Regions:
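Short helix/turn-capping signatures at newly exposed starts of structured segments
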Residues: 1-125
Length: 125
């Protein structure tokens, strides 16, 4: 992950601040999605030494968020807090804390107790 610049490479496609839905249409990930709903990328994607389920969120035609849910370990639904801990450990590997602000946006580990889900989020301004 390229936290200082906000760039992230997924299966040979680079995502970055100011990335647009028009840019996304030129990638192998594009399969006629509308850019309004959440766009899940098919299958687990390897980034550095971890595998993630990746979702993209666009707002007003620009990339708003990349959501990474690490699937290195199988976590039962009722134990999702273990995945949340793993996400914090991954950020720690990069020298990051749970919430990190940069000129381009934010990287943070999110755990939502209502939906019992966790993710590493790249939030672009």
């Amino acid at each position: 992950m390229y936290q200082k610049t906000g760039k992230i490479m997924i299966d040979g496609v680079e995502f970055y601040p100011d990335y647009t839905f028009e840019d996304f249409k030129k990638t192998p990930f594009y399969t006629n999605q509308d850019g309004i709903r959440i766009i899940p990328l098919n299958g687990a994607k390897e980034i550095d030494d971890h595998k993630y389920i990746v979702n993209l969120f666009f707002r007003d035609g620009k990339l708003y968020m990349i959501s990474l849910a690490c699937v290195d370990m199988d976590v039962p639904f009722e134990e999702e807090e273990k995945r949340a801990l793993l996400h914090r450990q991954i950020l720690d590997e990069y020298g990051l804390s749970d919430v990190n602000t940069f000129p381009w946006g934010t990287i943070k580990a999110i755990y939502d107790s209502r939906s019992n889900s966790s993710t590493i989020a790249f939030l672009y301004q």
